[in-house]
């Protein structure tokens, strides 16, 4: 399958998961057996929602042992009419985070609760100063060394202003899609601000779920935190209703309920700490700084509650306007009609979101380009720096860097390798989480999940297919960048600066020095360490298993019998490892494809040379493009 066709396909499915979230569980099971391009069976009634507890992992064990729920709606009123929800005042002694009871379609208000930790609202809207302080709050988290959402918010280094202002034992947990909402809600709570966020989505008007047509969504439910406010321990678990589908909203939006975010122009004023990045292949990140080289640094969260850091580059896909991909900012919210009490707190009122035509930095230029003759087809968009057209990711860098900035091939190569090395270190931690949880000691399941990149349960928490695809893409991008620098040279591009005498030799020397400095270690099944250099990783990259049921030796691509001697995988696991090779060879995260294969399915696909996976891994060797 070509990359462009794949993108059409995954946009066509449009995270059909979002639609499934609005169905009872019995209907979801029926839909799971139906190809996504066919009509789904009608939902059947079920007896109440069933909770799914978060798995305790080493990353979450540091948090207090209060129940945390990863909730998804199980039932809703007939006809999907608005479900009434009235605020109820009640004293709170000790509140634990429990699952919400029903699908929140329509407008809903958080229940008011009295007590020391009530979310008291003293101001009606964010100011420019609030936005600056929020940006600083995000920057400090990003530049700290905190490893989980809980650690970040309870650390005096990562969160110096608010770390001590929590109810005793309050846990903090956010994964991929939750993170932007969680951090925005947290800052609003700490600063006496109201907050509203989407709780349910459906297909956007004019969008169908037919195979081959792009899908995008509209908001059909919102949760409003207005005065008198709730206890935050009740309000925060509501954020678990959010999925990546809540970001897959079109730039030109026609839904009745306004979305949480809006697309912005690529400028320093709009791309800053707190801005959100939506990768259309299914991941969310939050910008924490833009450096003097125009590099966008971000934080992102994962199902095991870990928090990692990265740099925006070509590995993050550019998407079309209907996908909602790219850079977004929070839509301003204003509390209107509230009354102020003698103690300064507000009561009553309702939240109003600012419409697109009121937003000074709303822009769709990241989809349609900056050329005066904008193309209707986003794939043909041209991005200009002055009068010169550049590719999109270079455009982002040059727009955000100081005027006149030029790329230094040596420094770009150095930073690419360092970013890869940081990603490898983060993978070490991710694999360790699965090993510490004992997943590799469990029997191999008879099938893969319905999609290995977008799923729930232990696979979501412990498997690394998306992380590994990102890592492989980074290796490929390194090779492509070096090849481009070597081919073009500074004399042929006004955006490249190089002061040396032999660019190829200097690139090769930089590559060698940085590669030698990059080393990671993992623990084998018996606890003994294995030290791997950059060259070792490059050689075994497409042998590294993403499957958490495999031993750590195979998770790190071991092939030497001596290294594998401590691996306890049985014949079934070895067979699965071998059969997954085609999936390991691919870089594209096929989030729109059904992938609940058996072992025999994978073997048959290899025999028939199907379009699932790739027969051959891509070339990621850098030295070969520099040595003639």
Q: Residue spans of the language-model regions?
A:
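Bacterial N-terminal signal peptides
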Residues: 13-24
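Mixed-charge, low-complexity intrinsically disordered regions
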Residues: 37, 69-242, 251-255, 342-628
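Catalytic Cys-His active-site segments of thiol-dependent hydrolases/isopeptidases
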Residues: 280, 288-310
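Short, well-ordered loop/turn sites that connect or cap secondary structure elements
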Residues: 265-273, 277
